[in-house]
């Protein structure tokens, strides 16, 4: 898990105030701490769902409050920096990217909470085949989250591009699970309630890939200074190439 990370310099401008640099580094470090918390929450939620571990699920649900509190604290720190330092250019982009990133992390934390609340209410050991498929999808998105946090720590745009494309594989895996679940439902109508719950969980997990993709877009924005939201893969390649040629 990325709980402790040596933050790279990112070529931050040398400010007259060393305190400003310290404040920027502080909030970046806090983002990584929050990211590590969320990654652990998600991993525990997937484990609790697969193993039907009610004690672990309860700890995940309880831990969501800590994630929420950290989001608020980091957001408040961002507001203080903007009000006090009036950052511009890449410094302002960094503060904005941090504020947006923690919102995505908080939503991923909410998914972990929902998985625990929903799956433990509906599933039993007889539904183990459903849980195996959901665990596989969950582990895939956990790896995406781990990788995007690492890319964020280094503001590594090449790694961000790779992770951005990885979401297609998550989508394909999700679609395969949906087909499998529909087959279960057609073969045995008694599975309908549990299948519907599994579909809800699968969709929630799939959305984590989208959240990671959003964080990739924030990395693009910080490094390139251009908003890359709502572009497809081919258009993304073109825009990134154009920005590189402008150097």
UniProtKB/Swiss-Prot annotation:
Q: Write out the GO cellular component annotations.
A: cytoplasm
Q: Which GO terms describe its molecular function?
A: protein homodimerization activity
List the keywords (alphabetical). Answer: Cytoplasm, Phosphate transport, Transport
**At the top level of its lineage, which domain of life is listed?**
Bacteria
The biological process GO terms on file are:
intracellular phosphate ion homeostasis; negative regulation of gene expression; negative regulation of phosphate metabolic process; negative regulation of phosphate transmembrane transport; phosphate ion transport
User: Where in or outside the cell is it found?
Assistant: Cytoplasm
Reported phenotype of the disruption mutant = Has derepressed alkaline phosphate activity, especially under high-phosphate conditions. In single-challenge murine ascending urinary tract infection (UTI) experiments, quantitative cultures of urine, bladder and kidney reveal no significant differences, however in competitive colonization experiments, the mutant is significantly out-competed by the wild-type in kidneys and urine and recovers in lower amount in bladder.
- Predominant cellular place of this UniProt entry's protein: cytoplasm
Describe, as the record does, how this protein assembles with itself and its partners.
Homodimer.
The UniProt entry's sequence similarity note says:
Belongs to the PhoU family.
Its biological purpose is as follows: Part of the phosphate (Pho) regulon, which plays a key role in phosphate homeostasis. Encoded together with proteins of the phosphate-specific transport (Pst) system in the polycistronic pstSCAB-phoU operon. PhoU is essential for the repression of the Pho regulon at high phosphate conditions. In this role, it may bind, possibly as a chaperone, to PhoR, PhoB or a PhoR-PhoB complex to promote dephosphorylation of phospho-PhoB, or inhibit formation of the PhoR-PhoB transitory complex. Is also part of complex networks important for bacterial virulence, tolerance to antibiotics and stress response.
User: This chain belongs to which protein, by name?
Assistant: Phosphate-specific transport system accessory protein PhoU
Which organism does this record belong to? Escherichia coli O6:H1 (strain CFT073 / ATCC 700928 / UPEC)
Please name the taxonomic classification of the source: Bacteria, Pseudomonadati, Pseudomonadota, Gammaproteobacteria, Enterobacterales
Gene from which the chain derives: phoU
């Amino acid at each position: 898990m990325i709980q402790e990370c040596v933050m790279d310099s990112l070529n931050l401008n040398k400010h007259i105030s060393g305190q400003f640099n310290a404040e920027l580094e502080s909030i970046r470090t806090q983002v990584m701490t929050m990211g590590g918390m969320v990654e652990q929450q998600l991993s525990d939620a997937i484990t609790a769902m697969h193993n039907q571990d009610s004690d672990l699920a309860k700890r995940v649900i309880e831990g969501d409050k800590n994630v929420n509190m950290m989001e608020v604290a980091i957001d408040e720190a961002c507001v203080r920096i903007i009000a006090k330092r009036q950052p511009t250019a890449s410094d302002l982009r960094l503060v904005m990217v941090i504020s947006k990133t923690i919102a995505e992390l908080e939503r991923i934390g909410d998914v972990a909470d929902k998985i625990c609340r929903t799956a433990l209410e509906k599933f039993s050991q007889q539904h183990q085949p459903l849980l195996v498929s959901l665990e596989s999808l969950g582990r895939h998105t956990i790896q995406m989250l781990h990788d995007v946090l690492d890319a964020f720590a280094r503001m590594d745009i090449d790694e961000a591009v790779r992770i951005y494309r990885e979401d297609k594989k998550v989508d394909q895996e999700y679609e395969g699970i949906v087909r499998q679940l529909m087959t279960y439902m057609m073969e045995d109508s008694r599975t309908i309630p549990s299948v519907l719950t599994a579909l809800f969980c699968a969709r929630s997990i799939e959305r984590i890939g989208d959240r990671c993709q959003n964080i990739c877009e924030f990395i693009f924005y910080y490094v390139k200074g251009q908003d890359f939201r709502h572009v497809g893969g081919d258009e993304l390649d073109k825009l990134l190439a154009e920005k590189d040629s402008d150097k």
